[in-house]
Each structure stands twice: as C-alpha cells, then as structure tokens.
Amino acid sequence: MSNKHGHQARKRFGQNFLHDPGVIERIVRAINPKPEDSIVEIGPGLGAITEEILAINPRLQVVELDRDLIPVLRTKFFNYPEFRIHEADALSFDFSQLVSDRPLRIVGNLPYNISTPLIFHLLSQSGVVQDMHFMLQKEVVQRLAAVPGDNNYGRLGIMAQYFCKVQPLFEVGPGAFRPAPKVDSAIVRLVPHKELPYPAKDLKTLQAVVRTAFNARRKTLRKALAAMVTVEQLQSLGINDGLRPENLGLADYVRIADLLADTGKLQADDNEVSDD
C-alpha cells in the first residue's frame, strides 16, 4: 500500500507506518522529549513521530535503512538544519558513536521482523543509554516484561531485565497503522539500571546458561543444564533441580553463571544473537 508520499511499504523491512494522530501524541507524551536531550529514532518511516519530536528537539538524529525514505525525510524536514539522518542498518549500528555530552534516548516504531535481535543489540550498548521507548508487537512486550512462571517468560525477558527496568505503557490496535498489521502492538519503556541488581561475574556465561536452559524449556533444570552443571552443584546453590527453566528467576541464573565462571567451565559460545 502506498501513501501520500508515494512510498510503498516494504515487507522485507517490516514497514507499517503509524498515522493515528491520537496514538502519535500519546507516544510523544510518554517519551517526554526535552530540547537538551540527545535523541535517536530508529526507523522513522515517513516521520510521524519524527515531526513531533523535532518541534521540541531540532537536533534529533535518525537511523533509517530504506534509502527510498531518506529523500522523503530530507524534503519534509529541510527546515531543521541540525536534523541528521544515518543511512544504516540499526542491527549493526554503533549507537555509542552518537554520544556527546549526555546519554542517548532511543525511540522507534521497530520493524517487527527484527525487533528481538535489535533489542539484544541495543541491550549490549545500554551503558550509553538513558532510556528507550519502542512500539513493538504486543507479544514481544509481554515477553520483555514476563516474570517466572509466565508462559511468555524466557531469554528475552531475563536479559532485558538484567540490563533494564521494563515498563509496558499502553497497547495500540492495528488500525493506527498503514498497512494495518495482523497483530496488536504495544509501547514499552526500557530504562537501563544505574547499578545492575544482579551483576554477573561474566556476562557471556550468563547468556550461555540462559540460552541453554530455554532451548529445553519444557525439561527440568537437571536435564536442561546437564551439559553445564551437575545436580549436586544446583543443590549447593539451593536450587531445586526439578524445576523448569521458566520457574527460575534472574538472580538464580546469575548464581549458576557465577558458579560456572568460578570453575572456568563453559561449553557454549555466545557470539550469536538469537531468539528464545
């Protein structure tokens, strides 16, 4: 479906353009941009949110992969000389290069087809971030905020909560977009912890433990983590080896990872970012 700018939404970019003024206003109110903020928008699309933020903060920067959209944005916002467009893939973009005198505030209506790996990429750079506000598939927001025992609880939620406070804000129906997606959406706020509540001795070890556990989420911990820890080691930590991975909280996963870090035993490689 094309729009008044003549741009065809592209499936390969997961494009669904926000057009509902009420939803746009509510999102910007949640972000609460200030003139002095260092704000970066991922995937501005046709500039619906961009326009509202620029009116408050003319130094907004955006990261956009679709080269056909870039001239549309340049033309639309030609009267903002400090507005910067980075033609790049957000999945590999180094956001730390945009940091100047203050941490970044990152916002975006994220393409649903890359939202999970993109969030993992951004979590790895959370040290330079003040907060993040994203429009995501409702299910992804539920996974980000899930607690132990929840069916949505898994690797994404554990690692997001390791780095950030997760605050689901409100839901958005398909009618707010063109073309309308087949799923409901939701807005979430991620605020990196000033101090990690459960700092792991080795982050890669923690990531490997969590990924290994949830690759066998229906099995007991004794079976799911059999290649990494013994029943005796789990019991020494006071962890019931008969529980399933979805019953264990972040603090317990950190304790398992720290035990492995202390013993130097790790049989997994964490160079790859993957989903639950």
From Swiss-Prot:
Belongs to the class I-like SAM-binding methyltransferase superfamily. rRNA adenine N(6)-methyltransferase family. RsmA subfamily. GO terms for cellular component: cytosol. It catalyses: adenosine(1518)/adenosine(1519) in 16S rRNA + 4 S-adenosyl-L-methionine = N(6)-dimethyladenosine(1518)/N(6)-dimethyladenosine(1519) in 16S rRNA + 4 S-adenosyl-L-homocysteine + 4 H(+). Its main location: cytoplasm. S-adenosyl-L-methionine binds at residues 16, 18, 43, 64, 89, 109. This is Ribosomal RNA small subunit methyltransferase A. The keyword Protein biosynthesis does not apply. SUPFAM superfamilies: S-adenosyl-L-methionine-dependent methyltransferases (SSF53335). Specifically dimethylates two adjacent adenosines (A1518 and A1519) in the loop of a conserved hairpin near the 3'-end of 16S rRNA in the 30S particle. May play a critical role in biogenesis of 30S subunits. It comes from the Bacteria. Keywords: Cytoplasm, Methyltransferase, RNA-binding, rRNA processing, S-adenosyl-L-methionine, Transferase. Pfam families: RrnaAD. It comes from Marinobacter nauticus (strain ATCC 700491 / DSM 11845 / VT8). The keyword Methyltransferase applies. One of its GO terms (molecular function) is RNA binding. NCBIfam families: ksgA (TIGR00755). It is found in: Cytoplasm.
